[in-house]
Amino acid sequence: MLLLAVFCSLSAPAWADENTLSGNFLFNVISSSEPHREAIKGLLRGRRGLPSWVRNMVTRGDYVAIASVEVSVDGKPMQLFSACEAGRCADSSIKVLFSADGKRAVLDVRDKKLGGTTLGDPTPAEASVLLKDK
């Protein structure tokens, strides 16, 4: 019984961290969370003029990603990811903003050859987060 109590007390922080919005990587989240995956697929489905690495980001993780950060948008916690094309980070990058439950996503794409576009009809507050430092 004592061993079980020790195990549970040591494991509790790990369980608490599972739901954190910071420190996650985009491909891992898309691969493991159906709401996140479906939200991204919905944004990308049928879109033309996107870099191939962005169109394929759901099935292939061949891009460079920075760990997510939690941001507050209109008082609500959201998860912000940044990623770029391997070998072309200065020329082709994205920012993705997910609701805490992963069901809503907005995406900003910046590509030197193809230009920029924002998908998902972001609110003004969401757009300001996506376009910050651009």
What are these regions (language model features)?
Residues 3, 21-23, 59:
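A general marker of short, structured functional hotspots
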Residues 3-4, 14:
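Cleavable N-terminal signal peptides
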Residues 17-41, 109-134:
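C-terminal partner/receptor-binding element of secreted or periplasmic proteins
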Residues 41-105:
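Mature extracytoplasmic domains of secretory-pathway proteins
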Residues 1-2, 8, 19, 129:
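Intrinsic-disorder/low-complexity peptide segments enriched for small residues
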Residues 9-13:
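N-terminal signal peptide c-region/cleavage motif recognized by signal peptidases
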Residues 6-7, 111:
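An N-terminal domain-start capping segment
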